[in-house]
């Protein structure tokens, strides 16, 4: 692990990292997020009775779209040609929450961690948006990188 911030130059200014000379390698990242809610809200999602429609399908598409738009949201992220984005949603009624996991892949010169984190985060935000009419105190938490593969820094697993 590096002991310096790669997005800060010698003058202390933020800059986009130059990846011109880096080798193209297979890159993969997995992330997760959770959204806690009342049992009744989760039941609405699970049994399909939510008045806005299929919450999981909408959140999945939002997460995929968010991964593709990460460089528009995070100023110093490189625009990437993603080859795979997967967003999975799992109701966990025993914990009154939904677990969101994302997977992003590409062959490229820079990693896809931010894309995976953005996918999981925006999927959680979409669930909040769709359910806020019935519950405003839902909690989005534990957004984290689960695993990354490829590149100079190698393999990371939480």
Swiss-Prot record:
One GO MF term on file is: cyclic pyranopterin monophosphate synthase activity
Reaction(s) catalysed (UniProt annotation): (8S)-3',8-cyclo-7,8-dihydroguanosine 5'-triphosphate = cyclic pyranopterin phosphate + diphosphate
Show the coiled coil region(s): none
- Annotated InterPro entries: MoaC, MoaC_bact/euk, MoaC_sf, MoCo_biosynth_MoaA/MoaC, Mopterin_CF_biosynth-C_dom
User: Is the keyword Lyase assigned to this protein?
Assistant: yes
Q: Which Pfam families match?
A: MoaC (PF01967)
Q: Does the keyword Lyase apply?
A: yes
Which residues act catalytically here? 129
What's the family?
Belongs to the MoaC family.
This protein's assembly is summarised as: Homohexamer; trimer of dimers.
Lineage runs: Bacteria, Pseudomonadati, Pseudomonadota, Gammaproteobacteria, Alteromonadales
User: EC number(s) of the enzyme?
Assistant: 4.6.1.17
Gene3D superfamilies named among the record's database cross-references? Molybdopterin cofactor biosynthesis C (MoaC) domain
Q: Which GO terms describe its biological process?
A: Mo-molybdopterin cofactor biosynthetic process
Under what name is this protein listed?
Answer: Cyclic pyranopterin monophosphate synthase
Query: Its function?
Result: Catalyzes the conversion of (8S)-3',8-cyclo-7,8-dihydroguanosine 5'-triphosphate to cyclic pyranopterin monophosphate (cPMP).
- Residue positions annotated to bind substrate are 76-78, 114-115
CDD domains, alphabetized: MoaC_PE
Domain of life, per the record? Bacteria
- Pathway of action: Cofactor biosynthesis; molybdopterin biosynthesis
Provide this UniProt record's keywords sorted from A to Z.
Lyase, Molybdenum cofactor biosynthesis
């Amino acid at each position: 692990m590096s002991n310096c911030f790669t997005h800060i130059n010698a003058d202390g200014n933020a800059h986009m990292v130059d990846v011109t000379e880096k080798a193209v390698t297979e890159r993969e990242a997995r992330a997760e997020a959770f959204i806690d809610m009342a049992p009744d809200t989760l039941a609405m999602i699970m049994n399909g009775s939510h008045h806005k429609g299929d919450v999981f399908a909408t959140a999945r598409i939002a997460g995929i779209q968010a991964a593709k738009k990460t460089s528009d949201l995070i100023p110093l992220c490189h625009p990437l040609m993603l080859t795979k984005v997967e967003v999975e949603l799992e109701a966990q009624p025993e914990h009154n929450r939904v677990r969101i996991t994302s997977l992003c892949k590409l062959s490229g010169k820079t990693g896809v961690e931010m894309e995976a984190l953005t996918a999981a985060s925006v999927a959680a935000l979409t669930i909040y948006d769709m359910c806020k009419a019935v519950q405003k105190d839902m909690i989005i938490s534990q957004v984290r990188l689960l695993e990354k593969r490829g590149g100079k820094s190698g393999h990371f697993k939480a």
